[in-house]
A protein has these predicted regions:
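Mg2+-dependent prenyl diphosphate-binding active-site environment of isoprenoid biosynthetic enzymes
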Residues: 9, 18, 22-268, 276-286
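N-terminal amphipathic/basic leader segments beginning at the initiator methionine
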Residues: 1-18
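Short cytosolic juxtamembrane segments of multi-pass membrane proteins
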Residues: 289-290
Length: 290
């Protein structure tokens, strides 16, 4: 199981989905496709595929819901970059959506990607049955007001505060970043009809991986460079945002990231099945430069 090959399969599935003739709403789909195809690591769909692959080898069967996960993630990035949110003009090394298409179309493109993803998941559930429906609920919950959007709200209302509690910071990042990561992993296991015990273990794994991912993001915002990251750096500092660096410091965050990643590997080692590809990706996320 090659991670780069999986990324290519996800990329091709997304390109094929948006490579259709449109009429009066063509600019909407152009805007959606722009942000989808501009690049990205495809971590969330790959996590879903690798979680499924622990139990079953026919991972191509779930490329459709994996594609939907990436649409949800991309919609959140389009909205995050808007002037009323993070006001970013660079994403994945390219101008952000609203810089190319304007704010109004960018808002609608984000809305459309979320709705398109839910349509895909519902259609898939109607075809595949109860396991697909359970996976769809996990994903919908993760994207909603008690998930990713809830974390974004806490981020917004805490801008310019001198400090926030660790509990509130954990909530913000585990919802805004971690929830969709965890849902990708859990939904893959559910689609593979894993045992309840394993799903619980993978939920814990997803929680920890999401935390390590966010801490690593905070580290890269300090020590990374815009060329590698494909986006502007030092944004949190410039926007007076609290993060794990402001609470623990850079060196302690580096240690935490390593320790949490080791805990992730331990959880995977306790699961019977082919967890090696997921372990490889977990370590790559720790070592990433972007």
């Amino acid at each position: 199981m090659n991670i780069n090959s999986l990324k290519e399969e996800v990329d091709q599935s997304l390109k094929a989905y948006f490579n259709k003739d449109r009429e009066y709403n063509k600019v909407l789909y152009d805007s959606m496709a722009y942000s989808i195809n501009v690049g990205g690591k495809r971590i969330r769909p790959i996590l879903m595929l690798l979680s499924y692959y622990i139990y079953k080898s026919d991972y191509k069967k779930i490329l459709t819901p994996a594609m939907a996960i990436e649409m949800i993630h991309t919609y959140s990035l389009i909205h995050d970059d808007l002037p009323c949110m993070d006001n970013d003009d660079l994403r994945r090394g390219k101008p952000t959506n609203h810089k190319v298409f304007g704010e109004a179309i960018a808002v609608l493109a984000g809305d459309a990607l979320l709705n398109e993803a839910m349509k895909i998941l519902v259609d898939y559930s109607l075809e595949e049955g109860i396991s697909a429906l359970k996976a769809t609920k996990i994903i919908a919950d993760a994207a909603g007001s008690d998930g990713m959007i809830g974390g974004q709200i806490v981020d917004i209302i805490n801008e310019d505060k001198e400090e926030i509690s660790l509990k509130e910071l954990d909530y913000m990042h585990l919802k805004k970043t971690g929830e969709l990561i965890k849902a990708s992993i859990m939904s893959g296991a559910v689609l593979a009809e894993a045992s309840e015990g394993d799903i619980k273990k993978l939920e814990d794994f997803g929680y920890k991986l999401g935390l390590a991912f966010q801490i690593k993001d905070d580290i890269l915002d300090v020590v990374g460079n815009a060329k590698d990251l494909g986006k502007n750096v030092h944004k949190d500092q410039e926007s007076n945002k609290n993060n794990y660096i402001t609470i623990f410091g850079l060196e302690e965050c580096k240690k935490k990231c390593v320790n949490i990643t080791e805990e992730c590997i331990e959880i995977l080692s306790s699961i019977k099945g082919n967890t090696e590809p997921l372990k490889v990706l977990t370590m790559k996320l720790l070592e990433r430069k972007f």
